[in-house]
Regions:
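Mature catalytic core of soluble alpha/beta enzymes
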Residues: 4-8, 14-275
């Protein structure tokens, strides 16, 4: 994660998976005319639906089975990180309050807890009960009243998550979701896998995350367009090489309540309501 290049449209406090139409997906489409003019390594294009997100890939070079290996790795990561797939390690943690993880995922938990600390709890991976109560995990949206929100906030505190070796433990009323960091982690893992498989250049979108591998095949930087939050236009863009560009905003995943107010999926762990 140390190579990430962050471009923030809205303060990322905590959220669930991005919708299938994202600013980053649009950015990939916007860059495709440039990519089509490139020659050299063979181009591979494919799409994967996983983690509640449409993932789009453009890869140059690499072994013949690189697509198969990318798909397999995504499935492996989703099987571990999913909070809704019965029997997954994350599902087991939330149900049993104690779970033994593979070392790489125990380390991811530690890295996530460090992010929680660094943001003074603005990002809190234990805020899943809040996200769930508002219906963003099921699509059955509702507005919890003030009393319920207070009760939900009392269940949120990343400092109560214990990691001992590869074993993670939480309090009886807690639930954890790594959705706020999961796609960024997945992008990093996939980028490393592609390099191991001989990929010389790649651009791929995982919902709110765009990852680049190397430079474009002509040696120039990738240019990623950043869409305006509430308008069908681009604010500008960034030039990157071998980095990720990550955005999060409430303009893609939200609902309008009976009160006429718009409520988005980015939650404030301190209030139990959208940020």
């Amino acid at each position: 994660m140390k190579k990430w290049c962050l471009v923030i449209l809205a303060l990322m406090l905590c959220g669930c998976s991005a919708s299938t139409k994202t600013a980053e997906t649009e950015a990939v489409k916007n860059d495709r005319p440039v990519l089509r003019t490139e020659t050299g390594s063979e181009e591979k294009n494919f799409t994967v639906f996983a983690m509640d997100t449409v993932m789009q890939f453009q890869i140059y070079g690499g072994n013949d089975d690189v697509e198969e290996k990318v798909r397999g790795k995504i499935e492996e990561l989703e099987d571990t990180l999913s909070v809704t797939k019965e029997g997954s390690p994350m599902w087991n943690l939330n149900e049993k309050k104690n779970e033994n993880f593979a070392e790489e995922f125990a380390n991811l938990m530690l890295q996530s807890l460090k992010l929680c600390k660094d943001t003074d709890g603005a990002l809190d991976i234990s805020a899943y009960p809040i996200v769930k109560a508002w219906g963003f995990t099921t699509g059955e949206h509702r507005i919890p009243d003030e009393e319920e929100r207070k009760a939900l906030v009392s269940r949120v505190d990343y400092r109560k998550i214990q990691v001992n070796g590869n074993t993670v433990s939480i309090e009886p009323d807690m639930m954890v979701d790594l959705g706020s960091v999961g796609k960024g982690y997945t992008a990093e893992v996939l980028a490393n896998l592609m390099k191991e498989e001989g990929v010389t250049s790649a651009l791929f979108s995982l919902g709110g995350n765009i990852q680049t591998v190397g430079t474009k095949s002509d040696g120039s930087d990738w240019f990623i367009g950043i869409r305006a939050a509430e308008e069908d236009r681009y604010l500008g863009g960034v030039s990157v090489t071998d980095k990720a560009v990550v955005t999060s905003g409430g303009y893609e995943r939200y609902f309008t309540g009976d009160d006429g107010q718009v409520y988005w999926h980015i939650m404030d762990p301190k209030t139990g309501a959208p940020a």
